[in-house]
Amino acid sequence: MPELFAYTDGACSGNPGPGGWGALLIARDGDTVVKERALKGGEAETTNNRMELLAAIHALEALERPARLTVVTDSAYVKGGVTGWIHGWKRNGWKTSTKKPVKNEDLWRRLDAAQARHEVQWEWVKGHAGHPENERADALAREGMAPFKPGKSKAGR
């Protein structure tokens, strides 16, 4: 049975500013890539953390059936949030340990729902360190951001 991986990344030009997200879904049988799907998108005004979250969300939501997969991210924010902090946030009514509202609550809720139907293992990799699939996810995120960068006409979107 093929192993499924989702490599995700977000990018932002300014923080906040125009941003993009990218996700690369790969099914592997050993070292052989059986199937691959690239996803990308962007927004005119966003933050890097929102784009990182959306990359993971879109990767999980793109899967038509429940699956066992590894999501690989270079975002300590996403990995730390989804594997640890989120449990406390939910217990505390979406408040942090200091009783402040959780930033990006809308996306954390969506990510929580998206991962609930799958068996997900989360893995962190160092960004911009030559990891081929992470570099490809980064390129997709930058492509997703491109139509929203200053100087691009709205007709080109």
UniProtKB/Swiss-Prot annotation:
A Pfam family it matches: RNase_H
Catalytic activity: Endonucleolytic cleavage to 5'-phosphomonoester
InterPro entries the record matches: RNase_H, RNaseH-like_sf, RNaseH_domain, RNaseH_sf, RNaseHI
Tree of life domain: Bacteria
Keywords associated with the record: Cytoplasm, Endonuclease, Hydrolase, Magnesium, Metal-binding, Nuclease
UniProt cofactor(s): Mg(2+)
Gene Ontology CC: cytoplasm
Gene Ontology terms for molecular function: magnesium ion binding; nucleic acid binding; RNA-DNA hybrid ribonuclease activity
Binding-site positions, Mg(2+) 1: 9, 52, 74
Keyword Nucleotide-binding: no
Enzyme class: hydrolase
Cofactor binding mode and count: Binds 1 Mg(2+) ion per subunit. May bind a second metal ion at a regulatory site, or after substrate binding.
The enzyme's E.C. designation: 3.1.26.4
BP-aspect Gene Ontology terms: DNA replication, removal of RNA primer
RNase H type-1 domain boundaries: 1-146
Subunit (UniProt): Monomer.
Similarity annotation: Belongs to the RNase H family.
Protein name (Swiss-Prot/TrEMBL): Ribonuclease H
Species for this entry: Dinoroseobacter shibae (strain DSM 16493 / NCIMB 14021 / DFL 12)
